[in-house]
Regions:
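Regulatory N- and C-terminal appendages and interdomain linkers associated
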Residues: 41-256
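Catalytic activation segment of kinase domains across protein kinase-like and atypical kinase folds
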Residues: 2-4, 8-67
């Protein structure tokens, strides 16, 4: 659920990493079109736009490399296009592998089309309720293949409860084709779905304590917690929670 905020060409490295993080965040409530820069009113760098922006940036890079690819300009363009055309499949393959892991699914037990649809429908349900991204996957990693009392905690995240309950039934139907048991599946999901993320309101609290009061203890506690974000730690429940309305960081710019 990470949003760079301003993922333009100078913030994307040829090493395959985005850099220069300013108005960035790990999402709290999920929205396809969530942005994290107050000046991004058109949603150019929205969460769902990031894959396309990645390709756009690579096209700009390819344009600068055309003189090195071939002496003939049209031939150079063809070479660049041949490589750029592989981006979509490579991205979608990596995305599906990551999302399957988050949902405890394996490639051999379901088709790519089916599993892509299952993931997409979950994101739609999350979007409709603005369900917390991290907590949703964390709760799913605690559920069994059969309904149990743990379902209720996950359902509380969804204002559109029935939509999530319907999706949950489809997910469990898909799980029946998996060969691993609940314990192994849950362990795998918990290894890729963090319990804690650096939520913006917690980062802001650490900054305010340090700058306003010279108190770095809030920063050190948060920093220590995030060294092992996949393991639930006693007494740290508050770090799992999304912000209260008055805690939300609503204005972010480059440099914040």
């Amino acid at each position: 659920g990470f949003i760079h905020g301003v993922m333009n060409t100078d913030n994307m490295s040829v090493a395959g990493e985005t850099i220069d993080y300013g108005p960035c965040a790990f999402m709290d409530g999920y929205r396809h079109e969530r942005v994290f820069s107050s000046i991004d009113r058109q949603g150019r760098y929205a969460y769902s736009s990031q894959p396309g922006i990645g390709l756009w940036n690579l096209i700009r890079l390819a344009e600068t490399l055309l003189p090195l690819l071939a002496i003939d300009g049209s031939e150079a363009v063809k070479i660049a296009e041949r490589y750029l055309e592989t981006y979509k499949d490579q991205y979608e393959s990596a995305w599906l592998a990551g999302m399957r892991a988050k949902l405890g699914l394996t490639a051999g037990a379901g088709s790519d089309e089916e599993d892509r649809g299952l993931v997409g429908s979950l994101l739609d349900v999350m979007d409709a309720s603005e369900a917390d991204f991290t907590l949703t996957f964390d709760h799913l990693g605690r559920l069994g293949a059969d309904p149990s009392g743990h379902d209720e905690e996950a359902c509380k995240l969804f204002a559109q409860r029935e939509q999530f309950v319907d999706w949950l039934a489809k997910w469990r139907e898909r799980l029946k084709r998996e060969t691993q048991g609940d314990a192994a599946r849950q362990a795998g999901m918990q290894a890729v779905n963090p319990v804690y993320i650096p939520r913006n309101h917690q980062i802001e609290a650490a900054i305010r304590a340090a700058e306003d009061r010279g108190d770095f203890s809030v920063f050190h506690e948060l920093h220590a917690l995030l060294q092992d974000p996949y393991v639930e730690q006693p007494g740290k429940e508050r770090f799992r929670l999304p912000p209260e309305p008055e805690e939300m960081v609503t204005r972010t710019f480059c440099g914040t």
